[in-house]
Amino acid sequence: MTKTRILITTTSFQDTPGRHHDLLPADQFDIDRARGPLPEAEILRIVGEHDAIICGDDAFTRAVLQKCLPKLRVLSKYGIGVDKIDIPAATELKIPVTFCPGVNHVTVAEHTFGLLLSLTRLIPPQDALIKKGEWKRSTGRELAGKTMGILGLGRIGKEVAKRARAFDMNVCAFDLYWDDAFAKQHGVERKPTGEDVLRASEVVSLHMNLTDENKDWLNASRIGAMKRGAYLLNCARGGLVHQGDIAAALKAGQLGGYGCDVVEPEPIEKNNPLLAAPNVVFTPHTASRTYESVERQALMAAENMIRVLGGQAPHAQANKL
């Protein structure tokens, strides 16, 4: 029996125990592994002989996709965002691109509030001082009564809204595809534009997809419209914000803090301006990374791949062929 040769680049899929590994038995699959996220040059070096690829946030450009042919039958994205994949090129080249919606929204929402509480209650700096032998108290801020502004009220944004209401926060949001029933049930005020959300909120949380149209959307001009000292949370994509403008606003006090799970590019570069900015809490793109969500996501990514290889429809596909 000829084995199906696949490439797996996502590290959490590889490193986390779970049932997803059982879907790829050694007698059926010949598995190559790489440690992503990989830049274009590195992917070009290793692709071309695989029937299927389970990828993370690797740079699947047109050149990479062309190199994958003629053998590649499916590109299975482990995760939701497909902004690192050239979807028009994949469609033109007849490569199905699958993805994994609905598997990590609770996990990301919990992480969002972890970053927020770290900022408002100054947890990381106080922890660092105590470990240095200093017992120095700081004064933080309450969340109750403040306004949480959510940009992107999809699955993750909705979970953030529910948690904000549990903290007795007011919630406003903007989304092109408004869920009126959810908003009424959970007391979410609809704002006509994203800029209106910025002006109204003490806390702003980004949960938008990254597109060519909204790259660097949160820039100096829009930051200037925010309430002075507002907190910004980004568990979506680093490219949604102009990182230099964020750093400048933090230094000037226009932003009170930045909870940052994502940067552009990743891994973070040594000259990223955010590294020298005050009041930033970083995590290395791990908002969706819990044992529970990894298994859900990995199962769907593996099942999507197996379904397409077997001639069946996947759970979710990002392009129409």
Predicted regions and their residues:
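N-terminal glycine-/charge-rich "phosphate-binding" loop or analogous flexible N-terminal tail
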Residues: 1-52
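C-terminal helix-to-coil terminal segments
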Residues: 2-3, 15, 91, 98-110, ...
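Phosphate-coordination loops involved in phosphoryl transfer and adenosine-cofactor binding
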Residues: 3, 72, 144-147, 220, ...
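Conserved N-terminal Rossmann-fold NAD(P)-binding element of oxidoreductases
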Residues: 9, 150-151
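Phosphate/diphosphate ligand-binding glycine-rich loop within oxidoreductases
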Residues: 32, 39, 49-127, 141
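Rossmann-like adenosine-cofactor binding region
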Residues: 61-65, 176-273
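A short helix->loop->beta-strand "cap" motif at the edges of active sites that frequently abuts
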Residues: 68-73, 93-95, 169, 228-230, ...
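Phosphate-binding beta-alpha-beta segment of Rossmann-like dinucleotide-binding domains, i.e.
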Residues: 93-95, 101-147, 155, 159-162, ...
